[in-house]
């Protein structure tokens, strides 16, 4: 579980959390709401390890894998499919490990220990889903509104909004126990939005999402976390259930 106990969090001279205490349980889908500038994105920075608490105790299980949509505009000639496949960090790590072992085996083909390592590396890669990585990535890309003929198109050939859809697909491709989403519906049309809602409803891990879209939050979350006056308040229900007012999008 994720726990904050009497956490103090500052950005420069501004105190964003002052003695905040809350617990989020595994598998909960949380809508993080609050006025613009209240500290929602800063809390994400605490969760992903970019920032550290200035006081109190904060913990996320060390074994949890985390996924988050990169906010930078991707600049690459990689195909859309290859770019999204690269979001599977576990697969990438295993591919790199396999390449290193294959190089060692080429240099010492009679070394039985290296041969055994090579066999284990192939097994690990298969267990991680190497065989269906491409179709899994392409299902995400198509679900977010791309056409079949665009699957092999270079990322740089797309406009900014479509590239950010690819960043979203890349985050969804990453095996994760904790998924952080900051305004994920930006750049999405209705069909892609409906598809994303269905995907997130099936997601088995813990999810925390920032959004100004009340209907979207109602569709994909079951817990609401409200940040206001440097405190966190947890509600057992969607944002509509809590009757909280969402700020207009900045």
Give residue ranges: language-model regions.
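ABC ATP-binding cassette signature C-motif
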Residues: 1-244
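A short, hydrophobic C-terminal helix/tail in secreted or cell-surface proteins
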Residues: 245-250
